[in-house]
């Protein structure tokens, strides 16, 4: 799996967004960062990997803590632990600072926290960027039913309205607002295809016909399970 970690640096001080979760990556990234002062880590959707920089202050919303400790994030951690075995660091970061919606400054860098259903997104005004969990303009996403699709659409439309130059995600290369518009169209189409499908298998077949070149078949499998639970 591709898990992205972002390092926002200003004047020799850095803030980490998300944590790596494989032991070898934990060590490699810690070595890479050894000459920087790390002011803190924002732990949103990827709570595993607690052996990575355990001494650094950890920031998260209350719902993100619940997501990683007992919610959908915990279920994913358990699944990854079973799939990857001893190479996967399933320990969950202990959050030292519970944060809420709105602006917060860490290490001299301003962030704006936007709470989502599972955890939170992070706006970074100084570089006109936003971090969210998943986008992927040519990749399936995990969509937990029509209401979740609508929530993602509203979220992405908000980013388009705000005019962000860069959208950073955990599972894809950096993208832009054209990619957000593409994902909105995809989500609208998913809802239509689900409404006209008799079951999960029909739905997956219809989506694959519409988007034959999309990656992330495992995400589509999960989405089908949510739409036809």
Name the predicted role of every residue range:
Residues 7, 15-17, 41-44, 59-60, ...:
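Structural recognition of the beta-strand scaffold that forms the well-ordered cores
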Residues 161-166, 173-229:
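Accessory terminal helices/loops
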Residues 2, 23-25, 45-52, 65-68, ...:
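Active-site environment of divalent metal-dependent phosphoester hydrolases
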Residues 1-33, 120-134:
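Conserved beta-strand hairpin/beta-sheet module of binuclear metal-dependent hydrolase folds
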Residues 21-22, 67-184, 188-190:
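Metallo-beta-lactamase
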Residues 20-27, 98, 146-150, 197-198:
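Soluble non-cytosolic domains of exported or imported proteins
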């Amino acid at each position: 799996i591709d898990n992205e970690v972002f390092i926002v640096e200003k004047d020799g001080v850095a803030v980490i967004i998300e944590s790596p979760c494989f032991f070898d990556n934990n060590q490699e990234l810690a070595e890479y960062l050894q000459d920087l002062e790390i002011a803190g880590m924002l732990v949103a959707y990827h709570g595993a990997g607690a052996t990575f920089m355990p001494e650094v202050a950890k920031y998260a919303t209350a719902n993100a803590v619940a997501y990683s400790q007992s919610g959908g994030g915990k279920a994913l951690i358990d699944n990854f632990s079973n799939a990857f075995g001893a190479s996967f660091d399933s320990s969950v970061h202990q959050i030292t600072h519970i944060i809420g919606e709105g602006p917060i400054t860490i290490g001299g860098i301003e962030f704006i926290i936007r709470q989502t259903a599972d955890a939170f997104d992070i706006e970074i005004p100084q570089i006109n960027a936003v971090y969210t969990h998943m986008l992927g303009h040519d990749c399936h996403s995990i969509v937990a039913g029509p209401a979740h699709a609508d929530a993602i659409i509203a979220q992405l439309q908000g980013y388009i309205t705000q005019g962000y130059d860069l959208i950073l995600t955990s599972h894809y290369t950096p993208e832009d607002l054209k990619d957000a518009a593409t994902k909105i169209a995809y989500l609208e189409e998913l809802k239509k295809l689900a409404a006209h499908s008799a079951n999960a298998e029909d739905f997956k077949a219809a989506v694959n016909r519409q988007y034959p070149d999309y990656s992330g078949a495992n995400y589509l499998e999960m989405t089908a399970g949510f739409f036809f639970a």
